[in-house]
């Protein structure tokens, strides 16, 4: 089984890249399931029902979120009905939405879990404790478990991947918007990538307008960041090949589409 995961979609340009290239990626690589992180899809912060449906129409089977999940209040109008969307599992009890979703793929089920880190981020419940419980329950239904770990620091992401090695199919990081060069399959069969990168503006800073951020570094004054909409696009993703019987990963392949590395069908 092949799983395609597309990193943080940022703004309208990110959505355009998804609409343009995800169908082409699915045609080329033939993944059985496609997961897209959409937490920055609504002008850099949050998601709306319209955008959620756009991502599904473009080919997503599941949409994951992160620390900006609730930045756009529109999410409260549809999150409980969004059966293919997951917010971080380790939000406190009672927060709307769910942190795990199961997707049917032929005669198999795939569990998709969204987690948020705690180092240099808002302090949610312990992701290690929460995911332990969730994985134990998920493995009663399926050995194929994918985790989008939305976290800031590399050490926390690495620690979680080693902690779960052999228990889940993959742990792939999001949030920093910068792709890392450490894709590997750990000894017990868990695929790992510290950060898959972002999908959206290519010449901005983490997808935002450069000048605003540079000025903030120079004068240390508060500034409102804006998505770099008038820009060239990039898409960051990874393709994971998973053994359907054992749930163990066989390989993980980063995918990058940029003006410097165009897509070839």
Q: Which role does the model predict for each range below?
A:
Residues 1-265:
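Acidic, metal/ion-coordinating pockets
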């Amino acid at each position: 089984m092949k799983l395609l995961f597309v990193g943080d979609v940022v703004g309208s340009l990110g959505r355009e890249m998804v609409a343009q290239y995800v169908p082409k990626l699915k045609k080329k690589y033939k993944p059985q399931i496609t997961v897209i992180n959409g937490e920055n899809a609504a002008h850099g912060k949050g998601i709306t029902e319209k955008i959620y449906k756009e991502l599904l129409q473009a080919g997503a089977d599941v949409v994951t979120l992160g620390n900006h999940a609730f930045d756009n209040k529109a999410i409260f109008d549809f999150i409980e009905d969004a059966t293919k969307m997951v917010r971080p599992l380790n939000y406190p009890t009672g927060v709307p939405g769910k942190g795990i979703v199961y997707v049917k793929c032929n005669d198999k089920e795939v569990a998709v879990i969204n987690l948020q880190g705690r180092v240099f981020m808002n302090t949610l419940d312990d992701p290690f404790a929460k995911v332990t419980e969730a994985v134990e329950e998920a493995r009663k239904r399926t050995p194929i478990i994918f985790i989008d770990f939305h976290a800031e620091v590399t050490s926390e992401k690495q620690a979680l991947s080693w902690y779960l090695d052999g228990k889940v199919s993959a742990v792939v990081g999001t949030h920093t918007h910068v792709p890392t060069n450490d894709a590997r399959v750990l000894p017990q069969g868990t695929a790992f990538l510290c950060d898959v990168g972002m999908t959206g503006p290519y010449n901005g800073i983490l997808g935002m307008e450069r000048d605003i951020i540079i000025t903030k570094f120079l004068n240390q004054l508060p500034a409102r960041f804006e998505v770099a909409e008038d820009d060239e696009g990039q898409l960051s993703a990874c393709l994971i090949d998973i053994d359907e019987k054992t749930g163990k990963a066989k390989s993980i392949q980063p995918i990058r589409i940029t003006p410097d590395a165009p897509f070839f069908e």
